Amino acid sequence: MHDALDWKIIEENPFSKVRTQRSTVKVNEFVPREVVDKLMKKANPVWKVILGLSRYGGLRTPSETLSLRWEDIDWEMNRMSIPEPKVEHHEGRGIRSCPIFPELRPILDEAFEIFGDKSEYVVAAPQYRAAANTAMGWKNANLRSEMTRLLRRAGVSGWPRLFHSMRASRQTELQREFPLHVVCSWLGNSPRIAQQS
């Protein structure tokens, strides 16, 4: 089109007012368990839970991770009722049920021993939730800064989309064992979105 304008074949771009849909999909990088294990060794108890929920639970971080309460954990049924702040405005959404996967269970057990009687929330870090209750919302929780420091302490190189990539890695693993629609119901996304990751 630009050439046609430059060569004076046409006087103006007939499509200049037409809006196109651009792809907003960003590429996630698979985060191996060995990398998460290195981070866990350097993480404090709060950050072990954040990492575990993000990588092994597939929770959206920070919104779902910081919203999960101990009352949302059904230890006997080995399930979590995950609050979904990002999509709660959609009809029929707001909470989803997800198994407590075997990799996540010991992390939650340990966190409950430490924080269960001290904190209403699974991630016992009220400063992150307080920061999120401001104009910029969840972005203000600023978990990325602390995650970057943790990566440095562990001697691990970062990857694009730190928390999205951990969630997407969990999705990839689960899809190897379970049907796509089941995994999507657990992780709270659609098959279309899952296949873009």
Question: What do the PLM-derived regions correspond to, one by one?
Answer:
Residues 61-62, 70, 180, 191:
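Alpha-helix N-cap/start motif
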Residues 5-14, 112-117:
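Proline-centered turn/helix-capping motifs that create local helix->coil transitions or kinks
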Residues 16-17, 54, 77-85, 162, ...:
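Short functional hotspots where side chains directly engage DNA or cofactors
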Residues 41-48, 57, 98, 110-121, ...:
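Short, basic (Lys/Arg/His-rich) helix/loop patches that form interaction surfaces
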Residues 18, 68, 146, 150, ...:
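Residues in the recognition helix of alpha-helical DNA-binding motifs
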